[in-house]
């Protein structure tokens, strides 16, 4: 895959630590956001669900008319109140027409919902791919909690993939990552 027209390589996300022995932890903001946007509405690519706790995400979703109004003023420079109000009404109707309002929207955001995107190949491994935004469950384990916001576990990314291995990446810089990975 490519990001901003540049081919994605192992080093795009995986950076050696200062010793060159291990890799730095991958973080969403630094390594994932460019490919895995939190945009939930393809009609408004600049409007994203916050990468925050479930209560904040639920509050964002339940305040969508306000979020759309702020987005229209900030990003689309809609300054007339009537124009802004019409924009918000259109966006809310677009969501409703796709069954993405209220509980259905929350379910689609918190739980991956099975939306599958284009097939991609990473490090030679094929797969069905995922939509650019496929819900919190794309990376996190999400547990329903009845009427309360769901429990969202931190993404499970190990600090060391092979805890007992004694391998020094710095000694293998002449090799392509794909030769082993």
What kind of feature is each model-predicted range?
Residues 1-8, 17-138, 142-166, 170-171:
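Primarily the internal scaffold of c-type cytochrome electron-transfer domains
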Residues 168-181:
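Conserved mid-sequence domains
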């Amino acid at each position: 895959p490519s990001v901003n027209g540049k081919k994605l390589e192992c080093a795009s996300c995986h950076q050696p630590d200062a010793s060159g022995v291990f890799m730095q932890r991958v973080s969403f903001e630094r390594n994932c956001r460019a490919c895995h946007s939190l945009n939930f509405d393809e009609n408004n690519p600049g409007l994203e669900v916050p990468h925050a706790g479930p209560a904040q995400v639920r509050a964002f979703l339940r305040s969508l008319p306000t979020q759309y109004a702020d987005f229209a003023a900030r990003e689309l420079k809609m300054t007339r109140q009537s124009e802004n109000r019409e924009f918000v009404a259109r966006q809310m109707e677009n969501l409703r027409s796709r069954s993405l309002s209220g509980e259905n929207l929350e379910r689609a955001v918190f739980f991956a919902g099975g939306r599958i995107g284009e097939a991609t190949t990473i490090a030679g491994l094929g797969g069905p791919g995922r939509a650019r935004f496929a819900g919190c469950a794309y990376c996190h384990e999400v547990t329903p909690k009845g009427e309360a916001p769901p429990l969202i576990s931190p993404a499970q990314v190990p600090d060391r993939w092979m805890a007992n291995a004694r391998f020094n990446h710095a000694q293998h810089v002449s090799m392509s990552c794909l030769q082993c990975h």
